[in-house]
Amino acid sequence: MKKFCVEEQTENIINWIKDWYKDKSGYAIVCISGGKDSTIAAALCAKALGADRVIGVLMPNGEQKDIKDSKKVVDFLRIPHMTVNIGEAYNALTKSIELAHNFDNISDKSREVYKTNTPARIRMVAAFGIAALYGGYVVNTCNLSESVVGWETFGGDGFGCFSPLGKLTVQEVIAIGDYLNLPKELVHKVPSDGMCDSTDEEKLGFTYECLDNYIRTGVRPKSAEIYQRIMNLNKSSHFKHEIIHLPTYDPGLYICEDFNW
């Protein structure tokens, strides 16, 4: 079984991005959230194409406390960037839907799903708009760990033109970030949707370390409850990947057959 080598994989990804762009002109458009995935994806694109061919797009939803992390990313990488506040677009869309259908009849759970996923979809619309205006391709920044349990927004961050990280686990992505000497506070930032105080792992009910080990070794979690939770999330979200087939860097590493990936 092939083992993950951070130096080899990092160089391979950079070369893969170069190869993907060899017959294309224009920019790599990266939605910069301030988390590890967008930070590392932007850094890899800058290494492959040059910093001047990467446009970082910061998209706060109104007042957003962690937008400062997004600014750290573009400043550190020295890439061209712009800020597009999606707050007015989100509020206008929500108001229009409320006028068309009374929200009083909608469950709290459905409201939460809307509140979490709609900003991500608006951001992707904006990213493709910028790609059309400036000439470029939107970078998908999702990782394998998130994708196998559907922890991405269909029509939002799950979209893009190509995916440099889509077959790498969270632990592997972090290792690449450290290898590139990116700021540790960004590479090791605790993942969350930015909408509430809960982390992704708290919402998932298991750690990414546990999930990553299962993905790469095939050894199921000792907890039957966690195993079932992972499988339920995988099965309920697999339709996303039956529909979308992005060009994705393949590290040639084992993925457990349980995930039907």
Summary of predicted features, one role per range:
Residues 35:
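Conserved G/P- and acidic residue-centered "switch" motifs that form tight phosphate/ATP-binding loops
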Residues 39-42, 67-71:
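Short, surface-exposed alpha-helical segments at coil->helix boundaries
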Residues 66, 146:
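Acidic-residue sensor for enzyme active/binding pockets
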